[in-house]
UniProtKB/Swiss-Prot annotation:
Binding site residues for Mg(2+): D17
Organism phylogeny: Bacteria, Bacillati, Actinomycetota, Actinomycetes, Kitasatosporales
Top enzyme category: transferase
Name of the protein: S-adenosylmethionine synthase
Gene: metK
Keyword Secreted (UniProt): no
InterPro entries: ADOMET_SYNTHASE_CS (IPR022631), S-AdoMet_synt_C (IPR022630), S-AdoMet_synt_central (IPR022629), S-AdoMet_synt_N (IPR022628), S-AdoMet_synthetase (IPR002133), S-AdoMet_synthetase_sfam (IPR022636)
Amino acid sequence: MSRRLFTSESVTEGHPDKIADQISDTILDALLREDPTSRVAVETLITTGLVHVAGEVTTKAYAPIAQLVREKILEIGYDSSKKGFDGASCGVSVSIGAQSPDIAQGVDTAYESRVEGDEDELDRQGAGDQGLMFGYACDETPELMPLPIHLAHRLSRRLSEVRKNGTIPYLRPDGKTQVTIEYDGDKAVRLDTVVVSSQHASDIDLESLLAPDIREFVVEPELKALVEDGIKLETEGYRLLVNPTGRFEIGGPMGDAGLTGRKIIIDTYGGMSRHGGGAFSGKDPSKVDRSAAYAMRWVAKNVVAAGLASRCEVQVAYAIGKAEPVGLFVETFGTNTIDTDKIEQAISEVFDLRPAAIIRDLDLLRPIYSQTAAYGHFGRSLPEFTWEKTDRVDGCGRPPVWRADLLPLVH
């Protein structure tokens, strides 16, 4: 088999772009908590000493946006100008308008209801925009996620944990990780390189303090966790690069401006799957950029969990104002155990991919989104992440899902 290297990256919650994502989703949650029917599209720009929040919102709720912004920044850990930002004293500018009535009419009264006279309640809500969304799953990890992004997220999360719990007290909130894994064909076989870049206090020696601490308290525990999870990966002799530029004292918004929606590959599958281009954070679930991407993860994960393929990528496409998708495509990269046409047929029978049905089946009108905004939207076993359930493998609550005549090889 041919050997190749594949790389994915992650960032900590203190990365400027991730601060912006978390602020946008915190505002979204506050509005959904009071009014689950809120229509929200909130973007955040953060730079030295200033946060600017803009977008379109139609809601009956009230959210103290400036207060929410400051609380989130302080929670992340930016509480001093020495760290590059202070949530207590930063400026907050808000420019929020209402959702365009031209968009609202297509969402509130879908083409099927408005033009075709369809009375099905689920046909009343149209897609909030045109677009294409992808979902992906594979059997490389128990979470059915690609191993490179899985490990990169775990390293980023631990980097934040050892900062917050005082294990490495001189770390600051901004940080990045990157993982390069060698594949033999489609099988992950060896860890090649780990890159960890972390903002730190001044006067910290890289070689004698930071690098050994990162290896001992961040990287090695996560490699041990892989073994405990039953993931077989050769890790002897991997290369560890810690802050390869040298000093990393200036970080956060002082080092780089942050924007909502600039980490869409980190948010999804680390580049292992295609991406439709739409970001997630700050968008309520009437926006199919978000809800349909979650649904596609749900679909792909159930396909792999059912044993129909070891790798599955699913694409769905919508027209603005229409409820029914205009396209569905399944790719299994040659790993399918039955014909992909039958998998696609089963998906169409098992999953209702109209926006209102996705929102209903995944219970997406809850204030659950701020916790999605760092360390990945997929592959996390949290009860709020309903799109991670494999509840359609055996047809729970519905007629037999993976029907014997459609899927003869399923266990």
